[in-house]
């Protein structure tokens, strides 16, 4: 995944133009060695290049969960983090968020984790994915547009990591790939504080996937029932239905409100 705060000099339009008096933020640098010209790779190329999933860079941790248990019967949560040092992804599969992955000042600064939870609502399975766009410190607010762009670009890779890392589950229950993916973007800025439906998982994990604006987020039953799972009082991600005004702080426990996520 691209670093979400590694390109602070980019403008929010993503395709900046420069006047004759201005210099580009990331000028091309050339080195001459042995008579050859070697042009360095600028950060923009990585930022706007294709998002590619590499299975060899994924580390999977199963923490207190039955690999073969259907998520409609046992809570199943994904916690995905990225190391800028090793370029590796770490995916924890457990019943609750793996907060140990999210500790430390660097993770608090970057906030590039993705957490997700399987939900059964009115008898239908769906995957609810959460991304932190802004809030927490001023840098995240300044670059909220850029962070939203990067999260959208990298989410297909994230979803592929979920499917690959939890391979036994999908082999046993292939119908889960038909489940809708709901993406919750958490931000102090209203423009980026929203919920999007990315369609079925098998489509959402493709780079060309788009949002399905005609679909509405399903609502869980307000009382205990057998068609919704996990129950509201047991949900490992207790966020409100509406992302507006909701706090998303996975390091200290996600959300401050309980709702029908």
UniProtKB/Swiss-Prot annotation:
Q: What induces it?
A: Up-regulated during dark-induced senescence.
Cross-referenced InterPro entries: Staygreen
Q: Which domain of life is it from?
A: Eukaryota
Subcellular location, record wording: Plastid, Chloroplast
Give any Gene Ontology cellular component. chloroplast
What keywords are assigned to this protein? Chloroplast, Plastid, Transit peptide
Which residues are the transit peptide here?
1-54
Family classification: Belongs to the staygreen family.
Any further remarks? Corresponds to one of the seven genes studied by Gregor Mendel in 1866. The green cotyledon (i) line JI2775 used in the original work has a non-functional SGR protein (AC A7VLV2) due to the presence of a two amino acids insertion.
Protein role: Probably involved in the disassembling mechanism of the intact light-harvesting complex of photosystem II (LHCII) in the thylakoid membranes. Required for the chlorophyll breakdown pathway. Acts independent and upstream of pheophorbide a oxygenase (PAO).
Q: What is this protein called?
A: Protein STAY-GREEN, chloroplastic
Question: The organism's lineage?
Answer: Eukaryota, Viridiplantae, Streptophyta, Embryophyta, Tracheophyta
**Gene for this protein?**
SGR
């Amino acid at each position: 995944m691209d670093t979400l705060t590694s390109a602070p000099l980019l403008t929010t339009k993503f395709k900046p133009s420069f006047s004759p008096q201005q210099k580009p933020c990331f000028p091309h640098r050339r080195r001459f060695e042995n008579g050859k010209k070697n042009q360095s790779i600028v950060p923009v190329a990585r930022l706007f290049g294709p998002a590619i999933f590499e299975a060899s860079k994924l580390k999977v941790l199963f923490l207190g969960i039955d690999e073969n248990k259907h998520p409609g019967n046992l809570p199943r949560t994904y916690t995905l983090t990225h190391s800028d040092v090793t370029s590796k992804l770490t995916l924890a599969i457990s019943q609750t968020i793996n907060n140990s992955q999210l500790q430390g000042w660097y993770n608090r600064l970057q906030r590039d984790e993705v957490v997700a939870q399987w939900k059964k609502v009115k008898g239908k399975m769906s995957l609810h994915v959460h991304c932190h766009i802004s809030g927490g410190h001023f840098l995240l607010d300044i670059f909220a547009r850029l962070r939203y762009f990067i999260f959208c670009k990298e989410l297909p890779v994230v979803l592929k990591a979920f499917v690959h890392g939890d391979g036994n589950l999908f082999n046993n229950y292939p119908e889960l790939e038909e489940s809708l993916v709901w993406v919750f973007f958490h931000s102090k800025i209203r423009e980026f504080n929203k919920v999007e439906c990315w369609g079925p998982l098998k489509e959402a994990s493709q780079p060309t996937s788009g949002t399905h604006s005609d679909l509405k987020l399903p609502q869980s039953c307000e009382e205990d029932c057998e068609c919704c799972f996990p129950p509201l009082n047991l949900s490992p991600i207790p966020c409100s239905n509406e992302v507006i005004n909701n706090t998303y702080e996975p390091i200290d426990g996600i959300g401050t409100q309980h709702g029908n996520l």
